[in-house]
Amino acid sequence: MSPNSTLWQTILQDLEKLYNEETYNELFLPVTSTFKDQNGLLTMVVANEFLKNRINKLYIAKINELATKYSSTPVRLKFVSQEEVIEEPVADRKLTIDYRQGNLNSTYTFDSFVVGKSNMFAFRMAMKVADHPGAVANPFYIFGDVGLGKTHLMQAIGNYILDNDVEKRILYVKADNFIEDFVSLLSRNKNKTEEFNAKYKDIDVILVDDIQIMANASKTQMEFFKLFDYLYLNNKQIVITSDKPASQLTNIMPRLTTRFEAGLSVDIQIPELEHRISILKRKTATLDANLEVSEDILTFIASQFAANIREMEGALIRLISYAQTFNLEITMNVVEEALGAVLKTKKKTNDLNENNYDKIQSIVADYFQVSLPDLIGKKRHAKFTLPRHIAMYLIKLKYNIPYKTIGSLFNDRDHSTVLSACEKVERDMRMDSNLKFAVDSIVKK
């Protein structure tokens, strides 16, 4: 990773703490790493003009403050849209790939992946793909919410293949890095597509993480489409991850999404409590902390972080580090001391109090004069579906919890159903003033 990319990753860590999850995921996480460093000016790429203007207007001062804090030399950042970058000349940069390591994290293996009901099918199919790359499921498309193990499972495929065939050429690449490589090579000389294609085509297995980041990057999508077809026709294994099903991807060209759907799609769901406890036990063992963490404490931590395994493991690491630093036995009092700030922030930004969900459901039901059971239930008459969709939308808007979690509040509806409902309400509000008035009125209650 380049020094500029490292700087941005460090800034990202602070931005995640400073702003709510929705702002972080929508504005900052998809930003492509810098492609130019000129006299201390780092240029960052975002998907479109709207995101560029929003960041430059509302957040650039804080971002540059953090850049100054973490950089050893004077530096400032500016944000440009994807289309601006294509037209702006930059210095040449050779694209190099280390196939021996494939950009893989060696700790992401099948053995270290904790299997449960929520990821069993995805795990078993991943192992089949690793055993027979290019032959069983191609492309292999893994989707699910943030922090549930998609990257781990994807890289486990790569590590397994490398362990069993050192001659295999494997590449793991995040979608934003793919965009950065494309932009850097083509911004001066648009005829360099041959060099770009040659580097990426010379592989046996490609692992592309967070494909949704390519949204709106039309030129990059076209190049990826060409690469996809070449690899597929030559029986090279393609593995892709995303935060949503291929059919729900927005601003990704249909010719790509239909190809994603033509392979095998598997989802990783939110793990049940027992599964989360098992994950924590495995993590505790790998930390080799020589500290006993009781079942009750593991259960408490698991119950507080239902939707994001990465956050849950981070909380455990923080707890153990705190106990080691002050030479403490891990008790509930120590848990409160070590994780108090984390849990308080989590409650503030992502309140998981079910009664508050009930309150939104009740207010919406009263407004539309339908019963709560009908609002939550499966009746499909418009009298019930509209308020049901609005209730889903408002819960997502206020608490920003995973779509799967919202679905569990409405008779166990699935991720895609809730996502579709929320997008429909948001879309229809732009065209229907009566609907917007109704939603605004409910919000004021």
From Swiss-Prot:
Its main location: cytoplasm. Residues 1-73 are annotated as: Domain I, interacts with DnaA modulators. Residues 324-445 are annotated as: Domain IV, binds dsDNA. The keyword rRNA processing does not apply. One of its GO terms (molecular function) is ATP binding. PROSITE patterns: DNAA (PS01008). ATP binds at G147, G149, K150, T151. It is found in: Cytoplasm. Residues 73-102 are annotated as: Domain II. One of its GO terms (cellular component) is cytoplasm. Transmembrane segments: none annotated. It comes from the Bacteria. GO terms for biological process: DNA replication initiation; regulation of DNA replication. SUPFAM superfamilies: P-loop containing nucleoside triphosphate hydrolases (SSF52540), TrpR-like (SSF48295). Belongs to the DnaA family. Plays an essential role in the initiation and regulation of chromosomal replication. ATP-DnaA binds to the origin of replication (oriC) to initiate formation of the DNA replication initiation complex once per cell cycle. Binds the DnaA box (a 9 base pair repeat at the origin) and separates the double-stranded (ds)DNA. Forms a right-handed helical filament on oriC DNA; dsDNA binds to the exterior of the filament while single-stranded (ss)DNA is stabiized in the filament's interior. Domain I is involved in oligomerization and binding regulators, domain II is flexibile and of varying length in different bacteria, domain III forms the AAA+ region, while domain IV binds dsDNA. Oligomerizes as a right-handed, spiral filament on DNA at oriC. PANTHER family: CHROMOSOMAL REPLICATION INITIATOR PROTEIN DNAA. This is Chromosomal replication initiator protein DnaA. It comes from Acholeplasma laidlawii.
